[in-house]
């Protein structure tokens, strides 16, 4: 792309020679940022220390607030990202108590512009990487970034004994970000919240000869399932993907790992979960599938919360952290990937609207538009986790039940693209004049859970 394009919601999109964006970390945040910046006409250099785009995980949900961004790609077609092998074709999200009584069935339709899709995480990352490569974006794997630098006019990194120069650096290097401390001057110690998470996804053939587990697959030819069970101090989600080709399950249980590990996720047998389920009336039903998890297919991690950073942008204004590097989430709100994608879209828009001579302004406006929204969702995710693990199904207070935090409308229905175009000038004025900026993408009362907020 060498000529200017136009955007009906903004000014002319500049040629790639006008701006070079270096992106460190090619997970969901980094790959989406690479694609969004490429769509604006910028030159993108993507760097990833791993040899490929594979990432551990089971199922990730991309709700309407992020899917509407991806839907703008490829002339409005999602065919390049979505196929039967990487999605869960569910018709309802079903919630149960520990006795197996269904408490809620939320109709689910992937074509609903608010609800979005459930993906196999590895499949989604592979699709994003493939699409970025098809666009001709310069993605470099197996590259270790050693340091970051900026001047008044440029920013860049030192990687594999090479100095790489651009107009700005976007660090999307995840929860264990090396860039965070360098760019923001902050590197807060994550707090262990006393919960251990387990997750797995494996070929459904592993349970094909287990009669007690066939309930998981009985409707697989027509639809996948997604069941969540909430008991005191333990929650379990189990279901299928790709029309029954895969079984996935995840569990969060209050407690602590006996050993501390440097890696954030460790292979582990499912035995601790099977032990927890022994006291559940519905436990044997769930254990029938979980017990057949193949060796090496279950992973455990201690859940740790990271407090909101005071700032995301470097002192010189040419480097920024996004995604988990800026605001990691506990898994309960299901918004980690979604907010990373929102970050990426807003980044591209702010660079476009600020212009190439105002890169520091662009990055600081990104922070203004995004910081309070993601900070509130971080807080709400912790509140949701307490509700899920308390499992107060019989409480007279609706706010205490596990159903209280499902699908908050202000989160899922948000259009960050329209919002960024509408609010850019107000946020830019706040940055330039040192004014307070009042965000319009969070509830006025500043609370995550809204009384009538569920979709």
Swiss-Prot record:
Belongs to the paxM FAD-dependent monooxygenase family. One of its GO terms (biological process) is alkaloid metabolic process. The keyword Glycoprotein applies. The chain crosses the membrane at residues 11-31. Pathway: Alkaloid biosynthesis. The active site is at 199, 229. Its EC number is 1.14.13.-. FAD binds at residues 48, 61, 121, 324, 337. Notoamides have been shown to exhibit antitumoral activities. Notoamides A-C show moderate cytotoxicity against HeLa and L1210 cells with IC(50) values in the range of 22-52 mg/ml, but the IC(50) value of notoamide D is greater than 100 mg/ml. Moreover, notoamide C induces G2/M-cell cycle arrest at a concentration of 6.3 mg/ml. GO terms for molecular function: FAD binding; monooxygenase activity. This is Notoamide E oxidase notB'. It is found in: Membrane. Glycans are attached at residue 75. It catalyses: notoamide E + NADPH + O2 + H(+) = notoamide C + NADP(+) + H2O; notoamide E + NADPH + O2 + H(+) = notoamide D + NADP(+) + H2O. It comes from Aspergillus versicolor. The keyword Nucleus does not apply.
């Amino acid at each position: 792309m060498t000529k200017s394009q136009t955007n009906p919601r903004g000014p002319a999109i500049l040629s790639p020679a006008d701006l070079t964006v270096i992106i460190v970390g090619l997970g969901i945040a980094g790959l989406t940022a690479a694609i969004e910046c490429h769509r604006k006409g910028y030159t993108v250099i993507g760097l990833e220390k791993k040899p490929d785009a594979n990432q551990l995980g089971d199922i990730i949900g991309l709700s309407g607030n992020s899917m509407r961004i991806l839907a703008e790609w490829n002339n409005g077609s999602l065919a390049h990202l979505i196929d039967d092998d990487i999605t869960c074709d569910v018709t309802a999200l079903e919630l149960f108590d520990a006795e197996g009584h269904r408490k809620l069935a939320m109709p689910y339709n992937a074509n609903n512009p608010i609800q979005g899709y459930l993906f196999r995480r590895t499949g989604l990352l592979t699709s994003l990487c493939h699409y970025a490569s098809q666009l001709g974006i310069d993605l470099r794997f197996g590259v270790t970034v050693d340091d970051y630098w900026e001047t008044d006019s440029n920013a860049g990194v030192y990687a594999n004994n090479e100095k790489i120069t651009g107009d700005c650096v976007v660090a999307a290097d995840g929860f264990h970000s090396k860039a965070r401390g360098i760019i923001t001057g902050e590197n807060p110690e994550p707090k262990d919240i006393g919960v251990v998470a387990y997750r797995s996804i494996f070929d459904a053939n592993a349970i094909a000869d287990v009669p007690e587990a066939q309930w998981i697959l009985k409707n697989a030819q027509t639809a996948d399932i997604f069941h969540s069970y909430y008991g005191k101090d333990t929650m379990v989600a189990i279901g299928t993907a790709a029309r029954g080709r895969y079984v996935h399950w995840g569990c969060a249980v209050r407690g602590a790992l006996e050993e501390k590990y440097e890696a954030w996720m460790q292979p582990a047998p499912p035995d601790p979960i099977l032990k927890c389920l022994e006291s559940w009336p519905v436990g044997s039903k769930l254990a029938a599938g979980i017990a057949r998890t193949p060796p090496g297919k279950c992973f455990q991690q201690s859940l740790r919360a990271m407090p909101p950073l005071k700032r995301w942008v470097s002192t010189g204004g040419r480097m920024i952290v996004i995604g988990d590097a800026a605001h990691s989430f506990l898994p309960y709100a299901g918004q980690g990937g979604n907010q990373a994608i929102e970050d990426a879209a807003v980044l591209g828009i702010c660079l476009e609207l600020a212009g190439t001579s105002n890169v520091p302004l662009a990055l600081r406006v990104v922070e203004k538009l995004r910081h309070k929204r993601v900070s509130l969702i971080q807080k709400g995710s912790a509140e949701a986790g307490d509700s899920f693990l308390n499992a107060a199904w019989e409480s007279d207070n609706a706010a205490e039940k596990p159903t209280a935090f499902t699908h908050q409308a202000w989160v899922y229905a948000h259009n960050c693209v329209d919002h960024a175009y509408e609010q850019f000038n107000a946020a830019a004025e706040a940055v330039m004049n040192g004014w307070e900026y009042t965000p319009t993408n969070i509830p006025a009362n500043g609370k995550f859970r809204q009384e009538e907020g569920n979709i």
